[in-house]
UniProtKB/Swiss-Prot annotation:
Residue ranges of the region described as G3: 372-375
Region annotation (G1) ranges: 320-327
Protein name: Translation initiation factor IF-2, chloroplastic
Gene Ontology MF terms: GTP binding; GTPase activity; translation initiation factor activity
Pfam families: EF-G_D2, GTP_EFTU, IF-2, IF2_N
Compositional bias ranges of the Polar residues kind: 35-45
Organism: Euglena gracilis
Length: 822
């Protein structure tokens, strides 16, 4: 018993009736105090104010003031009888809310005029002041409610507490009608509305999380690189897959189709990497090992003492698509006419020039070194080399042509090398020029102009009329000033070989760019596989120099062999050190060549897997410079070689000599010369031995002629060609008991003998030879259009009116390197 304190919440046993000592009633402490009520139909009654320990019947009493805690009324427990049938109850015990946070607030205390809300069990309710009036016995519907976060503000029925599994359970009693029912509905509607808002917020949160996950996934997704550099040690299959944004399984599949087995962790050589990258249209550059000479790039300027560094002129490379005006721009700056001396008006080698002019700002003498690169697609490696040795790149775009494939490639080279770019929109004086369209295409290619809020400066120029050239030079000097270019002229010279060739009188000649230090006559120079003591230094005009400071391109004589374009050079203290360095490079190169040869043999084995083999054409290539040799080899690789294979026996710069002719005679090779001369003794030997020798000065002509020679070795092929078509107009009996078709030629001509097809409703009924045609009563060999004739066949006579006869003739054609699309 408890006569004072907090209200008592009785336990309810819903399984069976029992008796217990009743507890005295309590007076509510406030109108909002919680007072659980259990309503169970019962025949007997107990005095008002008593509380039973289990489900019992309460008889409504006359309205009277509630009892006070000071004068409790104690009564004996009353044994109650259960009704004939247990009350119907709907209970859901899935979720049990916390006891300290009830879902529904307690109803106001029972008082006069409020008894209607708690009328007899199942009563009508709503009869204020006459609680218990409705004495109809109806089973109460007890529901277990799902907790609501916002339910604390809603009005509803009182909740009961029940021990369930050691936790408090909230039991809601659903009224059956009256004002209580209306309040319960109102509270439930508010809860449902709050729940709908909560679900909507949760759904929005889920969508936001999904969008964030997608953004992170896209940001982390691998992007295909446009240019891949491969060192002498090769790359693993997994590394190739990462750079191509594919799976290692894709790389393994490509190699498997070529007859090469591989694994994701396996390292493959440069040749196999190129096969995979060609499949996905990605360019591959072979880089030398980054120790020894190649590692000197890391020593440029960075290892020098700060007080020894001085400002140096900028090195500017001009790049862009073919015929967009790169060389014309350089002509105007140099005040020369280089284009007039180039074959077909296109640049086919790297040109390096040192230009002196008055500064556009203060008129002081200013120096800039320019490098002009080819725009033809065959000179990809030259453009890549130009991008790696430059400080600033000028991307020339024609205003009437826009961004072209080689323009995009040049942009990719500059981005890969991290070189700042200045865009020169050329030919603004021509009809059809549209600079705005060019800037839009540049933005799509990843270069947003400064005028549009980007970081790439653009200058509108006309290389022929000189419009905008002053502004372009100012932009170059401003960009160089921001870059703060410095070098140490007191250090031994280091730099890059821009171009090299073999001169018949002077020997190997190398065009080099000094990037740090000063190159002097008499220095011992090493360039990977070659070395030598510098005998002479000349500028682009042929003037002799005693020394070459940083950022100056010069020609060097004295090397023992022609170096490869792109090689790094360095000055050593003695010839012994130079020889040791070259020997070390040769050993490394041999190891790499063994791996390359093994890969090449696997590819050739795959080409001959059908047992038929390929016809091989041997070629000896002689070019003016090593860069041209590199470009022509790349161009010849683009020719289809599924039917005939090109094999380069020798590819080197220099004129055609007697030894070249003897090598061609012993190997059965064709000699190709590009911008070279032929020694007189070699010319006489070529005529005597009958060697095929062709020389060119334009790379387009060389590639086209080689394609024609390759197709000539394939021979002719017989191809069926449609000659005519006829329609069967009548069917009649022939003398030999067979049926003959009376036909009208509707297109072309019918020829005998020839191969024909008989079609009925586009379905082929017969394919075979037509040996005889009759015109009236005469045998003829040919019938033209709109002419009637008779046709009889030895193996077919199921003619019907409306049948079509298609006649084919055989045509002899030159076999092509690749199949002609249908």
């Amino acid at each position: 018993f408890q006569s004072s304190g907090s209200p008592i919440k009785p336990r309810i046993n819903l399984d069976r009736p029992s008796t217990s000592t009743p507890t005295p009633p309590e007076a509510p402490t406030s109108p909002s105090a919680r007072q659980p009520v259990t309503q169970v139909p019962q025949a007997n009654s107990v005095p008002a104010g008593a509380v039973a320990s289990q489900a019992e019947v309460k008889k409504p009493a006359d309205p009277q003031p509630p009892a006070t805690p000071s004068a409790p009324v104690l009564r004996r427990p009353v044994r109650t009888a259960m009704p004939a049938s247990p009350p119907r109850m709907v209970i859901n015990l899935d979720d049990i809310p916390d006891r300290s946070k009830p879902v529904w607030p307690a109803p106001p205390p029972r008082a006069k005029g409020q008894g209607g809300g708690k009328g007899g069990k199942g009563g009508k309710g709503g009869k204020g002041g006459k609680g218990g009036k409705g004495d109809r016995e109806q089973p109460a519907v007890v529901r277990r409610a799902k907790p609501r976060r916002t339910a604390s503000t809603a009005e509803g029925p009182a909740a009961e507490s029940k021990e369930s599994g050691g936790r408090e359970a909230q039991i809601w009693v659903t009224p059956k009608g009256g004002k209580g029912r209306d309040k319960w509905k109102k509270g439930k509607e508010e809860v449902d509305k709050s729940e709908a808002l909560l679900l909507k917020a949760r759904k929005k949160t889920r969508l936001e999380r999904k969008e964030r996950r997608e953004e992170v996934r896209e940001a982390n997704a691998a992007k295909k690189e446009e240019i891949i550099e491969v060192g002498p040690q090769g790359m693993t299959v997994s590394e190739i897959a990462g750079k191509l944004a594919i799976t290692p399984a894709n790389v393994v599949t490509v190699l498997f189709k070529k007859g090469i087995m591989s694994a994701p962790s396996q390292t493959i050589a440069y040749d196999l990497v190129k096969i995979v990258c060609d499949e996905y249209k990605v360019e591959v550059l072979e880089v030398e090992e980054e120790d020894g000479i190649a590692s000197m790039e890391d020593r440029f300027v960075l290892d020098e003492e700060a007080e020894a560094l001085v400002s140096r002129p900028p090195v500017v490379t001009i790049m862009g698509h073919v015929d967009h005006g790169k060389t014309s721009l350089l002509d105007y700056i140099r005040k020369s006419n280089v284009v007039a001396g180039e074959a077909s008006g296109i640049t086919q080698a790297i040109g390096a020039y040192h230009v002196e002019f008055a500064s556009p700002t203060d008129g002081t003498p200013t120096f800039i070194s320019f490098i002009d690169t080819p725009g033809h697609e065959a000179f990809t490696a030259m453009r890549a080399r130009g991008a790696t040795v430059t400080d600033i790149t000028i991307i020339v775009v024609a205003a009437d042509d826009g961004v072209r494939p080689q323009t995009k490639e040049a942009i990719a080279h500059c981005k890969a090398a991290g070189v700042p770019m200045v865009v020169a929109i050329n030919k603004i004086d021509k009809d059809g020029a549209d600079p705005e369209r060019v800037m839009n295409e540049l933005a799509q290619a990843g270069l947003v102009p400064e005028e549009w809020g980007g970081e790439v400066p653009t200058v509108k120029i006309s290389a022929k009329k000189g419009l905008g050239i002053k502004e372009l030079l100012e932009m170059i000097l401003l960009t160089a000033e921001v870059a703060d270019l410095k070098a140490n002229p007191a250090a031994p010279a280091e730099g890059t070989v821009i171009e090299a060739y073999l001169d018949r009188t002077r020997g190997p000649v190398a065009t080099v760019l000094v990037q740090n230090g000063t190159l002097r006559a008499g220095d011992v120079v090493v360039t990977n596989a070659t070395w030598g003591r510098v005998r002479a230094i000349m500028d682009e005009k042929g003037a002799m120099l005693e020394a070459a400071p940083p950022s100056l391109p010069v020609q060097v004589l004295g090397l023992d062999d022609v170096p490869a374009a792109g090689d790094k050079f360095e000055v050593y203290a003695s010839e012994k050190e130079a020889r040791d360095k070259v020997d070390e490079f040769e050993r490394t190169k041999k190891e790499k060549n063994w791996a390359s040869l093994a890969s090449r043999d696997l590819v050739r084995l795959d080409n001959n897997a059908d047992g038929k083999g390929l016809e091989v054409m041997n070629v000896i290539l002689k070019t003016d410079v090593s860069g041209s040799c590199e470009a022509i080899r790349a161009a010849l690789d683009t020719l289809p070689q599924t039917k005939i294979e090109l094999r380069l026996i020798l590819a080197s710069p220099g004129d055609i000599t007697v030894s070249d002719v003897n090598l061609a005679a012993s190997t059965g090779s064709i000699i190709l010369g590009f911008n070279v001369d032929t020694f007189s003794a070699a010319e006489a030997l070529i005529k005597n031995l009958g060697i095929k020798c062709m020389t060119f000065d334009v790379i387009y002509d060389l590639v086209d002629q080689m394609k024609a020679v390759m197709e000539g070795k394939l021979g002719d092929e017989q191809i069926p060609e449609k000659a005519g078509e006829a329609e069967v107009k009548a069917v009649f009996a022939a003398r030999n008991g067979k049926k003959a078709a009376g036909c009208l030629v509707v297109a072309g001509r019918l020829v005998a003998p020839a191969f024909i097809e008989v079609l009925r409703k586009k379905k082929i009924l017969f394919s075979g030879q037509l040996f005889q045609l009759r015109r009236m009563k005469d045998n003829v060999s040919e019938v033209g259009t709109d002419t009637e004739c008779g046709v009889t066949l030895d193996d077919f006579d199921d003619w019907q009116e409306g049948d079509r006869i298609v006649c084919y003739s055989t045509v002899t054609r030159q076999r092509a390197l690749e199949a002609t699309p249908a």
